[in-house]
Amino acid sequence: MIDSDISAIMSGIIRTSEQNHHPQSQEYRHMNPSQMGAEELPNDLQSLSWLTSVDVPRLQQMTNTRMDYSHTSQNPLMQQSGHLSNNVHSPGSMIHVPTSMQQGILGLSTLTSHGSNMSQYSMAGHVSPSLQAQQPVYQTHSQQIYGLSQGSQCSSANLYNSSYRAQAQFTQPHLAAHPTQELQPKSYPKPIYSYSCLIAMALKNSKTGSLPVSEIYSFMKDHFLYFKTAPDGWKNSVRHNLSLNKCFEKVENRLSGSSRKGCLWALNPAKIDKMEEEMQKWKRKDLPAIRRSMANPDELDKLIMDRPENCKAPSKLVESEVQAMTTIGNLPGRIPQHQPHRVMTLSLQSIPLHHQIQTQARIASGSPAPAQSPPIHSVPDMTHSPLQQHIMSRAASDFLSLTSDMNTEVDALDPSIMDFALQGNIWEAMKDESFSLDTLGAFSSSPLQLSDCDLGTIGLTPVSSSGDHSFSDFQVTSLYTTYPTLENVAPSQCVPGSGTKPIALL
């Protein structure tokens, strides 16, 4: 008897649910199959599994009060809650939404109306006691929307937090990845220079010309940022180049107490020019690639050409010292400050130019003057200065060759600037004794050192002599001049007692 009543009640419930809550089969035929999901198909047979654990008195109450909670199609939001709870024994956990309602699932009105149903259910799927007394308002069949009281509706913010929480966990890290990509440092290519050239740059730009291996690493990482992120294998290459390349030599670190640790590396002075030539070759080969690999491309020329003092080549060092010596020699302090007598000048404008070109400059070995006739005024000697002694000790041959070249250039000067200073009253004495330079014969080849007489520094009018005779030999040795025996000259034109007596020029 009881079984027959239960069967009658169940069949009535099924017929009522089919009539009120499911569209006819013709509606599914007219729908686009691509818009229908698995949850939108008729699922009456799938929802019959709860009949084995149903409460008969509660079903009777639901039938009498027209409660439809067990036959609506499942809401996607409640389906997520059902999967999380894994408990479908209660009829309240299986809430279905009709197919006609699938167009408004994502709408706020549908979500807010069914959000109250979700808030009334626990995660285990049991019906809250407050729902048993509520009377939902049934609206038209075409919309299939269940409206509840205004107080039981939930806000859209709560629905967003509950339904889209899983999706937000994936979208937020995706959006946060863009700033990190923009903040990534700029990648620098590997420099085209060889490791030996990079090591040479580091040593050339050091203060002392020698560095430990760790500071060579730091130099390369500071100026070529590729090595900051490169694998540590490049450090082994640097050590191999230091050990095997003859351009580098190990220097003992005197400041270090242990001989094994803290050794320094320096450039071989004989290989500096070769390394600079190698750097310039790579620079001419691909300058844009080198600039792209550098942290500061404007420092390229400085890194290639700069040298510490102890890394300068010997030839360049001597040349710089000779230039410094020449500068010191041209200072105003070198001019004699005391002029006790009036100085006259003797011009050699009457000397033919071809005779002057034939004369060659030589360094005088000594003065032909006797010991009892010292010079009236002496020129300061620079050979005793410390700088001159240092230069002569290191590069005597280069300095002498440079001096000889200067004397050769002096021979080709205009004769109008080759004035010799005569001191005292010698010129008046020669005029009183009717001394004439025209009577002099030829010049003898003798060196002339212009450093002994300051030419052009005193504004005196040169005195030139006139005559038709040319001088073939005129010997000037240091501070003295001598006149040899005259040939083809009348005795009356000679100065009595002149002979080979030296005449002081200063």
UniProtKB/Swiss-Prot annotation:
Query: Where is this protein localized, as stated in its record?
Result: Nucleus
GO annotation terms (biological process): amacrine cell differentiation; atrioventricular canal development; heart looping; positive regulation of transcription by RNA polymerase II; regulation of DNA-templated transcription; regulation of heart contraction; regulation of transcription by RNA polymerase II; retina layer formation
Q: Name one GO cellular component term.
A: nucleus
One example of the protein's molecular function in GO is: chromatin binding
Tissue occurrence: Predominantly localized to the developing eye. Expressed in the eye anlage at stage 18, where expression increases between stages 21 and 26. At stage 26, localizes to the prospective retina. At stage 29/30, expression is strong within the eye vesicle, in the midbrain and in the nephrostomes of the pronephric kidney. After stage 30, expression in the nephrostomes decreases until stage 33/34 where it is largely absent. Expression in the eye decreases after stage 33/34 until stage 38 where only a few cells in the ciliary marginal zone (CMZ) show expression.
The family database entries (PROSITE patterns) matched by this protein are listed as: FORK_HEAD_2 (PS00658), FORK_HEAD_3 (PS50039)
Q: Which SMART domains is this protein grouped with?
A: FH
Residues within the DNA-binding region(s): 190-286
Q: Which InterPro entries match?
A: Fork_head_dom, FOXN1_4, TF_fork_head_CS_2, WH-like_DNA-bd_sf, WH_DNA-bd_sf
Keyword entries, A-Z: Developmental protein, DNA-binding, Neurogenesis, Nucleus, Transcription, Transcription regulation
Q: Which CDD domains match?
A: FH_FOXN4 (cd20057)
A single Pfam family it belongs to is Forkhead
Looking at the record's lineage, which domain of life comes first?
A: Eukaryota
According to its UniProt entry, what is the function of this protein? Transcription factor that may play a role in neural and some non-neural tissues development, such as retina and lung respectively. Binds to an 11-bp consensus sequence containing the invariant tetranucleotide 5'-ACGC-3'.
- Name by which UniProt lists this protein: Forkhead box protein N4
Which species is this UniProt entry from? Xenopus laevis (African clawed frog)
Q: What is the lineage of its organism?
A: Eukaryota, Metazoa, Chordata, Craniata, Vertebrata
Gene name tied to this protein: foxn4
